[in-house]
Amino acid sequence: GEAVEFPRKDGTPFAVKTQPRPVSKEVEAWVTTAGNPETWREAGRAGANVLTHLLGQSIAEVEGKVKLYRKALAEAGHDPSRFKVTLMLHTYLAADRETAREVAREPMKSYLRSAAGLIKQYAWAFPAFKKPQGMTNPMDIDLGSLAPDELEAILDFAFLRYFDDSGLFGTVEDAVKRVEELKAIDIDEVACLIDYGIPTAVVLEGLKPVAEVLRLTNSGSGADETMAGLMFTVEGEPEEL
């Protein structure tokens, strides 16, 4: 927990401390999984928390994996109620859904562009995509063979699907609905991913509706529902919703 010095651009030292301060006798551990069911089981057997996301897996698929995880915890002698499943979601909220969509569109398309495997899956589901004759596996798609306008159309399709199904996007009302949906499948925390290319000032302004979602969905939970509490957690660890 002691400060560690790192050099600034000009070479002068800058002391960095971890936040929040380590006060627990034991440090909690999270296993990160992209969706492999066996990883969920291993995390349960090891008595670790889980961090996952919706890139390449649906909410329904995550629900099944959470059940596998809780079962593995119990079979290994752990109390399942003491362990957390944290779901990371790309996040941006605004006063109306259209504004949120347009602010997030290009940054999310750039983010998705870097995930070749995911783009191949979306291309496979894109109605206008002409699958090469004899190809049965989307991972066999050669993205380099796509014309620029074809790739752009697939990215637009991928973004709209992701915006609607796999993130914390839209209005406060949209986000509350999504969080309640996640609570119903036994998700303990939502980690709001906000630094994926949206300008900093816009991101910070967008924390205000996120704080309102926090207030509405954590009512009575004892969590810090103030903006100060939200800002602290965003700078430190994933926020609970």
Listing of model-derived features with the role each one plays in the protein:
Residues 1-19, 60-184, 220-240:
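An alpha-helical appendage that flanks or caps ligand/catalytic pockets
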Residues 22-28:
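A local structural motif
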Residues 29-32, 50-53, 83-90, 190-192:
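Hydrophobic faces of well-ordered beta-strands that scaffold small-molecule active sites
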Residues 35-59, 65-66:
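A conserved active-site cap/scaffold subdomain adjacent to cofactor or substrate pockets
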Residues 46, 185-187:
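Structural motif
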Residues 48-52, 160-165, 191-197:
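Glycine- and acidic
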Residues 54-59, 192-204:
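Glycine-rich, proline-tolerant flexible connector loops at the mouths of alpha/beta enzymes
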Residues 62-70, 199-220:
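C-terminal helical cap(s) of enzyme catalytic domains, especially alpha/beta-barrels
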